[in-house]
Design a protein with these regions (language model features):
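Hydrophobic/small residue at the entry helix of a nucleotide-binding pocket
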Residues: 207, 234-235, 319-320
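Helix-to-beta-strand junctions that scaffold the AdoMet/dcAdoMet cofactor pocket
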Residues: 221, 328-329
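C-terminal hydrophobic helical "lid"/dimerization subdomain
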Residues: 2-23, 322-326, 367-443
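NAD(P)H dinucleotide-binding glycine-rich loop of Rossmann-like/cofactor-binding domains
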Residues: 102-111, 117, 144-230
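Rossmann-fold NAD(P)-binding glycine/threonine-rich loop
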Residues: 339-355
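A short N-terminal beta-strand-loop micro-motif at the entrance of redox/enzyme domains
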Residues: 4-20, 35-73, 112-114, 129-130
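Glycine-rich beta-strand-centered segment in the early N-terminal region that forms part
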Residues: 58-75, 88-152
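Adenosine-nucleotide cofactor-binding segment
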Residues: 228, 244-319
Length: 443
């Protein structure tokens, strides 16, 4: 592994294909025999530092259509946190089912799970049938792993019955020195970004693109008013940028004055600070307060000059969903991709059916959508929202930060890269966008 890292750091990328693939590598993993380690504890008390381990593991066998990537940097997503606390289910069930699919997938069913759904690195080897990529290519990866043997997946690969999220529902993820991916997960690394910056957008940028921009999601157009929950977070920060770049009008909901300042630095003008407004959408565990929905709607109209949101960008889930359905414009769209505050949503259906609103479920992105989202990064139209970077040995703390929402934007992790700031190829473009690239750093 050290020889591979040294070749990459020396820019000897043409030599990569001649280097031996190591028999083992270090990866961040959870263990099957520790699935019950948090049993009986409330979710908030489950500490990823207890369950995430950095260990030496065997390098998986490379199969047809696959690639082994030398990973320079990765990042932490909520699915890493879910894996680490074994909620809502243990991911070992995913690996067991995937392992039964074929002889090729059997290797994923192991007593450990190497996690991570983002990477930036260099292709080390490609399997039979891979023609687009070669050893030495600098790449990032999106996290859709799909078999594409069913006709349902050929219209939209997210509809494939064998669609999985790499590093969450499959093994050999990106929080490691090496990763195993399908070749159709690979995309060109933006040359003006460092390894850690390039690794940060993948999952959340692609998710936001499908959810907000794609015809498979809200199909946002110029002039749309878009209410964005958690607008300074890992997902919302990309939705905010896409709304601004697409000619829409984002109304950014944040939870502190500091987060309000972050979205203003991105260019947002209409900002709602939930902490200052004191919204309480739930009277108690069982009953919501429609008067609070109305108060939110009034605030939105004050900011927009009387317009209700054409689109509500939803991901908090239970806590906000009733309010989201209420405040959306007549004929508007509530598009949801997650439920971080709870999966059991409750809303007043009269505001949905009588006002001809629609709820759209959105999950990650297909290859085309992920590619287009990455292209926006490469063009300098969308920028990473990386706030902090940890070494791989401290990945438990990185996951804890995300678990406790003690972070802004994305939290990065160095794997093979020995330090931050490496991997830039296009210095002129970087200089042009440096302020935007760094606006989340240190916040």
């Amino acid at each position: 592994v050290n020889e591979i890292r040294d070749a990459i750091l020396a820019d000897h990328l043409s030599d990569i294909g001649g280097l031996a693939v190591p028999d083992s590598y270090r990866g961040v993993l959870v263990r099957r025999d520790e699935q019950d380690v948090f049993e009986g504890l409330p979710t908030k008390e489950k500490d990823p530092r207890r369950s995430l381990h950095v260990e030496e593991v065997a390098t998986p066998e490379l199969g047809p259509g696959e690639a082994v990537v030398a990973v320079m940097a990765s990042s932490v997503n909520y699915n890493t946190v879910w894996t680490s606390i074994f909620e809502p289910v243990s991911t070992f069930g995913f690996l067991a089912r995937y392992g039964k699919l074929s002889e090729l997938t059997k290797k994923h069913d192991l007593p450990y799970h190497v996690v991570g759904s983002d990477l930036a690195g260099v292709v080390l080897r490609v399997g039979p049938g891979v023609n687009k990529w070669k050893p030495g290519d600098e790449v990032v990866a999106h996290c859709l792993s799909v078999e594409l043997e069913d006709p349902a997946g050929h219209d939209d690969t997210m509809m494939d019955p064998q669609q999985r999220i790499w590093g969450f529902e499959t093994n050999f993820g990106g929080l490691a020195e090496l990763a195993l991916v399908k070749s159709n997960q690979l995309m060109p690394k933006p040359g003006h970004l460092t390894w850690e910056e390039a690794a940060a957008p993948g999952l959340v940028n692609s998710t936001a693109y499908r959810q907000l921009v794609s015809h498979n999601g809200a199909n946002m157009k110029q002039g749309d008013t878009v209410l964005i929950w958690g607008a300074s977070g890992g997902l919302g920060s990309y939705a905010t940028q896409m709304a601004l770049n697409g000619g829409a009008i984002p109304v950014c909901v944040v939870s502190s004055p500091e987060k309000a300042e972050i979205v203003r630095r991105m260019g947002a003008e209409l900002v709602i600070d939930r902490s200052a407004e004191g919204y309480r959408f739930w009277k108690d565990e069982h009953e919501q307060d429609p008067k609070e929905w109305q108060r939110l709607g009034k605030k939105i109209r004050e900011l927009t000059g009387g317009d209700d949101p054409d689109i509500v960008f939803e991901h908090p889930g239970r806590e906000t969903f009733g309010a989201s359905v209420y405040v959306a414009k007549k004929g508007g769209t509530i598009v949801t991709c997650a439920s971080t505050s709870g999966y059991m949503h409750s809303y007043d259906n009269r505001y949905l059916w009588m006002n001809l609103k629609r709820i759209v479920g959105s999950h990650f992105a297909n290859y085309k959508e992920a590619w287009e989202a990455n292209r926006l990064i490469d063009k300098g139209l969308i920028h990473p929202t990386l706030s902090k970077v940890y070494p791989m040995e401290e990945v438990g703390q990185a996951a804890l930060d995300v678990h406790r929402n003690a972070h802004q934007g994305k939290v990065g992790v160095l794997t093979l890269a020995p330090e931050e700031g490496l991997g830039v190829r296009d210095t002129a473009k970087r200089e042009q966008h440096l302020e935007a690239i760094n606006r989340f750093r240190g916040v």
